[in-house]
Curated annotation (Swiss-Prot):
One of its GO terms (cellular component) is ribonucleoprotein complex. SMART domains: Ribosomal_S6e (SM01405). One of its GO terms (molecular function) is structural constituent of ribosome. GO terms for biological process: translation. Belongs to the eukaryotic ribosomal protein eS6 family. The keyword Ribonucleoprotein applies. The lineage of its organism: Archaea, Thermoproteota, Thermoprotei, Sulfolobales, Sulfolobaceae. Transmembrane segments: none annotated. This is Small ribosomal subunit protein eS6. HAMAP family: Ribosomal_eS6. It comes from Metallosphaera sedula (strain ATCC 51363 / DSM 5348 / JCM 9185 / NBRC 15509 / TH2).
Length: 212
């Protein structure tokens, strides 16, 4: 059974407060099982005061610009944030398993409250087939139980789900706006293929928001 790509957004992170931090990749933070396969997020340790400064909740994003050849690329990693008073203020500690991704064991970075992240989840782990847009379900991420509301998704050919189309089947309908069509002129309409508002085994991506 194929994985669902579950995209989780945090509606409370619209006004993020980025801050410069020093990141250290250390031995006492272990890589998480399933981390490399995208089934969970890596863990970081952060001082409670740094976490408060970032306005972070359970998740923190660390971002750097890394030189690759003749160009700079953005590297962004989302973490499960665990508080530790032993970590100095202004620092974030994470696993040495991320050295290759970041390119160094100590570096300056920008950190902020995570806006959204994606996980690969086995369909057998979460029984979402038959659920519809607006339904809630619980997903555990690194021991954190998240209450999630389904907001949309897409199938294995990229056709998006629409909340106003009943059922799980594909339909060709006249659209005036997203999802499924973005007009370039006022009043423009097009017939497009979309999925209904019910999740089937043909869905590959499920979009959700955290409900508190």
């Amino acid at each position: 059974m194929a994985d669902f790509k579950i995209v989780i957004s945090d509606p409370a992170s619209k006004k993020v407060v980025p801050a410069k931090v020093k990141v250290k990749l250390v031995d006492n933070v272990q890589s998480e099982e399933g981390e490399k396969e995208g089934r969970t997020l890596p863990v970081c340790l952060v001082n409670p005061k740094t976490k408060e400064k970032l306005g972070a909740d359970q998740f923190i994003t660390v971002e750097i610009q890394k030189q690759e050849g003749d160009k700079k690329v953005k590297v962004k990693v989302h973490f499960i944030a665990r508080e530790s008073a032993e970590v100095p203020e202004g620092e974030i500690h994470a696993s040495k398993g991320l050295t290759e991704k970041f390119g160094a064991e100590e570096f300056e970075a920008v950190a902020y409250r995570t806006k959204s992240f994606q996980l690969n989840v086995d369909q057998g782990q979460v029984n979402l087939v038959g659920s519809k847009i607006g339904d809630n379900f619980t997903l555990s991420v690194g021991g954190i139980a998240l209450n999630l509301a389904i907001t949309g998704g897409s199938d294995n050919t990229g056709f998006p789900m629409r909340p106003d189309v009943q059922g799980a089947a594909k339909r060709r309908i006249l659209l005036a706006g997203p999802p499924g069509f973005i007009p370039t002129e006022d009043g423009e309409r097009r017939r497009k293929i979309v999925r209904g508002n019910v999740i089937s085994a043909e869905n590959v991506q499920i979009n959700c928001v955290i409900v508190r």
